[in-house]
Amino acid sequence: MAKHLKFIARTVMVQEGNVEGAYRTLNRILTTDGLTEVISRRRYYEKPCRRRQRESYETCRRIYNMEMARKINFLMRKNRADPWLGC
């Protein structure tokens, strides 16, 4: 069932003969899913050392992005106390 839903999510209908627009839409869907990166990475053999380095970098980047998003969400809250009352 899950593979079927993924297939439907990546199906793009060509409307009014606009093949270029459908192709752009398909590329955007594949890029957001991360498939283009996986395909280009599997095109050539990746040495185990480079794979560990890449996975470590991706883990650090993911943690950094999550923490940054948490901080930004905290700053964007509307109902928090104003730190500069007299200004």
From Swiss-Prot:
Organism listed in the record: Mus musculus
State the InterPro entries in the record: Ribosomal_bS21
Q: Which family does it belong to?
A: Belongs to the bacterial ribosomal protein bS21 family.
Gene Ontology CC entries for this record: mitochondrial inner membrane; mitochondrial small ribosomal subunit; mitochondrion
Question: Under what name is this protein listed?
Answer: Small ribosomal subunit protein bS21m
Which cell locations does it reside in? Mitochondrion
Which keywords, in A-to-Z order, does the entry hold? Mitochondrion, Ribonucleoprotein, Ribosomal protein
Superkingdom field: Eukaryota
The molecular function GO annotations come to: structural constituent of ribosome
Assembly? Component of the mitochondrial ribosome small subunit (28S) which comprises a 12S rRNA and about 30 distinct proteins.
Q: Which GO terms describe its biological process?
A: mitochondrial translation
Taxonomy, top ranks, is: Eukaryota, Metazoa, Chordata, Craniata, Vertebrata
Cystine residue pairs:
none
